[in-house]
Regions:
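ATP-dependent carbohydrate kinase catalytic cores
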Residues: 1-72, 82-86, 99-114, 188-192, ...
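Short beta-alpha connecting loops at secondary-structure transitions
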Residues: 10, 68-77, 140-141, 151, ...
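Hydrophobic alpha-helical scaffolding
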Residues: 12-16, 77-81, 93-97, 129, ...
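Alpha-helical scaffold segments in soluble metabolic enzymes
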Residues: 13, 24-27, 86-94, 103-106, ...
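Glycine-rich phosphate-binding/hydrolytic loop that grips phosphoryl groups
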Residues: 24-27, 77, 82, 157, ...
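Acidic/polar loop patches that form or flank catalytic/metal-binding clefts of enzymes
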Residues: 36-39, 89-92, 96-105, 206, ...
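Acidic, glycine/GT-rich loop-and beta-edge segments that sit at the periphery of enzyme/chaperone cores
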Residues: 80, 87, 225-275
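Activation-segment/catalytic-loop signature of the eukaryotic protein kinase fold
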Residues: 113-210, 214-216
Length: 275
């Protein structure tokens, strides 16, 4: 229980405790093995429910505990993108392309180039699955005609590419076919980014009406503990989502992702022998 002096003289029962990303996984109702959520903040944090057995990663991910419920432990695979929304902040604050992050969507949609520019936003290195702290940011395909719209679009694209890297690693580690990705966090409000994420991953993106999944997950855990909800099926009834489905041809997706992988290799090679 909590200390009474902090809660209006009442001792409130503590019904659940969870790390922020595990709480978000629960809040996104990823109760089944193979279900995946991704939180889009300054960075991105993707977790996959791998069921009641841990899957030691061989592809640069972290094996972790998701939660314990009714005496059973659920495990997860986790991958982190270091730079996501913070790259949009860089466009806003350092390059002054726009005044609010929300405007980035409008700029991206007005870009003339069709994903020809590639940005590798390794401002603090690259996270999963590379774990390369020495890599520096880079931009490939720039010409005299490259505009702020093109750079904004490419920066948003880079967020989606990095998450594709992690999702592919999860598929390799778990041998689970992933049908959809549940998203939350501030940058998930960007429709351009979510549509391109669906395209580049070739999977359905589900964005719930309430994107504060971390707080929701904590509430679910506490509510289950005190009997506000009696089981997970009751919680599932509360889900309403906006759906994004892939629109891009698979051949085009493969070409774009191959260019991204080439750009990452070049960026990593540039700093490889600096010592």
């Amino acid at each position: 229980h909590t200390a009474a002096e902090y809660f209006f003289g009442k001792r409130v029962p503590i019904g659940g405790a969870a790390g922020d990303q595990q709480a978000a996984l629960f809040g996104q109702q990823c109760f089944e093995r193979g279900s995946v959520k991704n939180t889009y903040g300054t960075g991105c944090f993707m977790l996959m429910n791998t069921g009641n057995k841990p899957h030691p990663s061989k592809h640069g991910l972290v094996t972790t505990i998701a939660w314990g419920y009714q005496g059973e432990i659920t495990y997860a695979l986790e991958g982190s993108v270091f730079v996501a929304g913070s790259a949009v902040q860089w466009l806003r604050d350092q390059l002054m392309f726009f005044k609010t992050a929300k405007e980035s969507e409008k700029l991206a949609l007005s870009a003339k180039e069709e994903h020809e520019l590639i940005v590798v936003p390794a401002f603090v290195g690259l996270g999963a699955p590379y774990w390369d702290n020495d890599c520096k940011g880079a931009m490939f395909g720039i010409t005299r005609g490259t505009s702020k719209e093109d750079m904004t679009k490419a920066t948003l694209d880079s967020i989606a590419y990095q998450n594709r890297d992690i999702l592919d690693a999860m598929k390799e580690d778990s041998s689970i076919a992933i049908q959809s990705l549940r998203v939350d966090g501030g940058a998930s409000a960007n429709d351009y980014l979510m549509q391109f994420q669906s395209d580049i991953m070739q999977c359905v993106i589900e964005r719930p009406e309430n994107v504060e999944s971390t707080a929701l997950g904590a509430a679910y855990l506490a509510g289950l503990a005190v009997g506000y909800w009696t089981n997970l099926e009751e919680i599932k009834k509360e889900r309403n989502s906006h759906i994004f489905t892939p629109l891009m041809k698979v051949s085009d997706v493969n070409d774009l992702y191959e260019r991204w992988q080439k750009a990452v290799s070049c960026a990593r090679m540039f700093t490889k022998n600096e010592e």
